[in-house]
């Protein structure tokens, strides 16, 4: 046996990863890139909802179930609008939580119902052309530290810029 001297790793990991991801991107078709966009956005929405519920001391054990149970219209919202819907709906859920003496089931029922109502309202307004791209979009604060995975995806695989936050994931935008 012997040591393999041919395997020399580059000193600049950043540059090496960028080269690898840039080489990988052309092998992905639009459907694969759309899948990545949806997965990242869905996880961001889930993390945002989790943080909002924790802030109000409401249990987070049903977050994924609540998000999966939303109507088809939910998928037509941008991530920024989903964040608005979540923020607005959690306010109603928190109010119910307090007025019901801490009944989480009642609060989460209000949350789910409010999400559907606000989603429908936004979809109707958007279809009527009554919304600008940034209306009812909650973008992260400037001090928010974006997860590395999102940075990597946006810089190398997706290359969609602000559409990540302002457009609903679609093949036309990839």
Residue positions per predicted region:
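Basic, alpha-helical nucleic-acid-binding regions used in initiation and control of genome expression
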Residues: 1-174
């Amino acid at each position: 046996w012997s040591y393999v001297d041919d395997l020399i790793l580059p000193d600049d990991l950043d540059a090496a990863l960028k080269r690898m991801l840039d080489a990988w991107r052309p092998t992905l078709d639009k459907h694969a890139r759309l899948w990545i966009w949806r997965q990242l956005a869905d996880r961001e929405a889930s993390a945002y909802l989790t943080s909002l519920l924790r802030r109000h001391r409401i249990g987070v054990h049903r977050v994924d179930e609540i998000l999966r149970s939303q109507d088809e219209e939910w998928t037509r919202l941008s991530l920024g609008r989903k964040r608005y819907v979540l923020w607005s709906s959690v306010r109603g859920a928190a109010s119910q939580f307090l007025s019901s003496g801490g009944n989480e089931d009642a609060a989460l029922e209000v949350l789910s119902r409010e999400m559907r109502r606000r989603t429908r309202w936004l979809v109707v307004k958007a279809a009527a052309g009554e919304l600008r791209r940034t209306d009812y979009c909650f973008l992260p604060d400037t001090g928010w530290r974006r997860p590395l995975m999102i940075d990597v995806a946006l810089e190398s695989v997706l290359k969609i810029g602000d559409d990540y936050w302002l457009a609903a994931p679609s093949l036309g935008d990839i």
